[in-house]
Every structure is written in structure tokens, then in C-alpha cells.
Design a protein with these regions (language model features):
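Alpha/propeptide regions of enzymes that mature by internal proteolysis
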Residues: 1-229
Length: 229
């Protein structure tokens, strides 16, 4: 059980991210760092810090098109360390310009989405899957809830995020379910003695509905002007 923490923030800056800039491979690149500190549990599919665990920060880093490094987790960890992020965290990467991220909020839940959709398609494709990590193109979704969720609810929240993403893509006229490298990170407060731990985060639960709406709006706002195919 974590140490006693201040009441969760439900104001407009729950996901208060810092935009960082660096030059790498001759390109000017950006990264978004959210560093809320202790007291957060995250469920993520990210290459760095994925799974379910307490995490202290989330980094969403832009990398160059044609990225060829074979150690993305180490690369992300080095970037986070250089930015002053201590402890363990979550690292996502994308070739999209993360400084153009879209944000949305609903009832205390917040979502930040960066989107690059040049390589997109349907999840159930007849093509054989490749081995290893795919090239970063990617819709990256980071969402935060000001309440505690059980492990099952965190997994449920990732499902809700994915469903809301696909809904937004279809409503935008895009004939796809996403890109092959999409990543998700859902953050919720760590459980405290005597505080409620929510067991559900599906799209018809109280907090899941808020999560779905915030992600849906953020994905819609993040999509570049691309002709449907």
C-alpha cells in the first residue's frame, strides 16, 4: 500500500506535460514528459515500462522517420534521464510531431493523443505479422483518471481506450482500426487505505464512460488532414 497522498487533482491540468526539444540525427524533435511523481499505477503497452505497475512518469518521444535503432527502450530511458525524470516510468515513441498533440477532458478524466496514420490498416489483416518492433508511425494515447482502479479495471480501461480510438477513426472517414504500432498508457491513482478502488472501467461504467469520451475527442482532434482510403 502506498504512502498517504494528497487528494487527487480533478482540475484542468491533471496531465500537465512538459514539451521538450532536442536535435537528433539532424532533425529537430520533440517529446512530451508527464512527471506526476509517486502515487500512480499505470497499465501500458509501451516498449519501456509496459505492463501494470506504479510508475512516476510518462515520456512520449518523437523520433526521426526511418528510425533504425534496435534498442528503443534504452533510447527512451536515456531521453527521460536527460530530462530529469527519476524512478521508473513509461516510454512511448512515434514519428509524429508530438508538439501537435490533442487534449480532451471529461469529468476529471484527461487524454492526450498524438497521431501519425500514414501506415494504417485493420487489425485482422490477412497479411502475416512481422517479428520484432515495427517502425514508429503510431497513435499514442496517454490517459489519466483521478481515482484508483483494480488491475482488472486497468485492463478494462485499455480496452475502452482502444474502442474509443477505433470509433473516432471510423467517424473521421478512415477505413482502419489503427496503425500497427499504436500504444496506450492509462494512469490511475494508487489505492489508499480506506479509499474506494473501482472495479470497472468499461464504456458504460462511470469512469470508463468519461475515459471513452475524452479519448474519443482527443483522437478526433489529433488526426491530420488525410484523405480517406
Amino acid at each position: 500500500m502506498s504512502a498517504l497522498l494528497p487528494p487527487p487533482r480533478t482540475g484542468p491540468r491533471l496531465l500537465n506535460q512538459e514539451c521538450l526539444t532536442r536535435t537528433e540525427d539532424g532533425e529537430r524533435l520533440h517529446a512530451l514528459l508527464w512527471h506526476p511523481g509517486p502515487g500512480w499505477r499505470m497499465a501500458s503497452s509501451a516498449v519501456l515500462g509496459g505492463g501494470i505497475a506504479e510508475r512516476a512518469w510518462v515520456l512520449n518521444a518523437q523520433v526521426a522517420h526511418g528510425y533504425r535503432r534496435t534498442d528503443p527502450a534504452r533510447h527512451l530511458a536515456d531521453l527521460a534521464r536527460a530530462a530529469g525524470a527519476g524512478g521508473t516510468g513509461v516510454g512511448l515513441m512515434t514519428a509524429a510531431d508530438v508538439s501537435a498533440a490533442a487534449r480532451a477532458r471529461d469529468g476529471g478524466v484527461e487524454a492526450v493523443v498524438t497521431a501519425g496514420i500514414s501506415v494504417r490498416g485493420w487489425a485482422a489483416s490477412p497479411e502475416e505479422g512481422a517479428t520484432g518492433a515495427g517502425a514508429p508511425g503510431t497513435i499514442n494515447i496517454v490517459a489519466a483518471l483521478p481515482v484508483a482502479l483494480s488491475d482488472a479495471a486497468l485492463v478494462n480501461a485499455v480496452m475502452t481506450v482502444t474502442e474509443a480510438k477505433v470509433q473516432a477513426l471510423l467517424e473521421s472517414g478512415l477505413d482502419c482500426s489503427g496503425t500497427p504500432t499504436d500504444a496506450v498508457c492509462v494512469a490511475a491513482r494508487a489505492p489508499q487505505d480506506g479509499a474506494e478502488v473501482h472495479s470497472f472501467a468499461g464504456p458504460r461504467s462511470e469512469w470508463g464512460a468519461r475515459l471513452a469520451r475524452s479519448v474519443h475527442r482527443a483522437v478526433l482532434g489529433s488526426l491530420p488532414a488525410v484523405a480517406p482510403r
